[in-house]
Amino acid sequence: MRDRRLGNVDDVAALAELRDREVNYDPSEVRPPEWNFDVHRSLVGCERPGPPEAGGVWEAARDLVRDYEFTPPELIRAVYYRRDPLLGRNLLLEGRFSLLRFYMGVRITALIDETRHQQEKVWGWTYETLEHHLERGNVTYEVVKHLNTGKVEFVASCQSQRSPAVGPVLRMGWRFFGRRTQLRFYRRCGQRLHELVRASLTGTPVSAGAQSPLEMDGLVLVPSGVAPHPLDRFTIRQYNPGR
């Protein structure tokens, strides 16, 4: 299984290449109508009002978000080095659509750990897309506890556009399926996080979430419970789709 956590992809070599890649957009470019701006909120669970409870909903959600366990495996999988600090960590993403597989890099460029307006305890991180990604932009994932009510939310905030370097075939596919799949991804992230938190607090098994992640030599495949499948060799793989 060495070096092949994403089917037939040499993920060790692919991750090494990401070290030299830059973010593929300039913040000054981010403006409507050329870019999409999305905020997706979903309820994770509830605690008593006040600071996050030890071993409670907020802490469970924070740990799952930290490890990128909430990603829906039917749409996105990822490999990264657990030993790398969270800030600056590179992730190799595998985007999955039918028999197509897209391999792209992102980098975590910001961490959030704060209390806002004395009303919300927030923890999260932001990743930005790297050169040759299918998209351009950033996503911020946050776990938010409303201190007055005890409600815990998962918030995904995204600024994105299709990479202009994408070829004509992928451009056509994006026109029909890209935006729809993108929105489905964020909905599924919220659903999965809710299910995983509930499972972690009650001991209820969850498919593709009840097992430990596949890990060798510090390289982790997430979400937990997924592994390369023999049929992966029949998929159509696109490396660096935004080249």
Regions found by a protein language model. Give the residues of each.
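Hydrophobic ligand-binding cavity/cleft-lining segments
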Residues: M1-S98, H229-R243
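Acidic, Ser/Thr-rich low-complexity intrinsically disordered segments
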Residues: T204-R243
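Hydrophobic, Leu/Ile/Phe/Ala-enriched alpha-helical segments that form helix-helix packing faces
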Residues: A61-P72, I112-T115, C189, L193-L201
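Beta-strand/loop substructures that line and gate deep hydrophobic ligand-binding cavities in soluble
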Residues: L130-G178
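Hydrophobic-ligand binding "helix-grip"
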Residues: L99-K151
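A conserved amphipathic terminal alpha-helix motif
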Residues: L170-M216
